[in-house]
């Protein structure tokens, strides 16, 4: 049996696998959140739960979105932000959702991603520079972000 200190460290204080960062759509049709696949997997994915069907699905997963095989690259600015907020997760650690928009935005690896909640369709905008803190507009058509700031 694994000792408590080892288990506590491996599961990052028993937070791996726990859902977090919930957002509710304006009509209450969808709840979006971040969660890894299991208590052994540190990479958060973006999930959506449908009130009409009661089904939960992964709508964005960095392992499938980043196909260069090198994994996630984190900028100095993003590392500093994660340290300030004591973020210990990996993968998708934050996203922007607006209750009136059918889309969600997040950033990783010098790319800006827009995901359709219902369709799970992902648009990847590779910008070639470090970006962080994307914010989606109420209608979901525009995304603002910070770069070199």
Each PLM stretch: what is its role?
Residues 1-149:
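Beta-propeller folds
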């Amino acid at each position: 049996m694994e000792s408590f200190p080892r288990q506590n460290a491996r599961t990052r204080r028993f937070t791996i696998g726990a859902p977090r960062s919930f957002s509710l759509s304006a009509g209450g049709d969808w709840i979006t959140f971040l969660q890894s696949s299991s208590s052994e997997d540190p990479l958060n994915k973006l999930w959506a739960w449908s009130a009409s069907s009661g089904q939960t699905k992964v709508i964005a997963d960095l392992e499938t979105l980043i196909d260069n095989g090198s994994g996630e690259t984190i900028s100095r600015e993003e590392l500093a932000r994660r340290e300030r907020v004591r973020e210990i997760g990996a993968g998708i650690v934050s996203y922007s959702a607006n209750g009136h928009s059918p889309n969600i935005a997040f950033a990783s690896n010098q790319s800006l991603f827009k995901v359709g909640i219902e369709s799970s369709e992902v648009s990847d905008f590779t910008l070639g520079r470090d970006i962080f803190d994307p914010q989606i507009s109420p209608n979901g058509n525009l995304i603002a972000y910070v770069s070199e700031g």
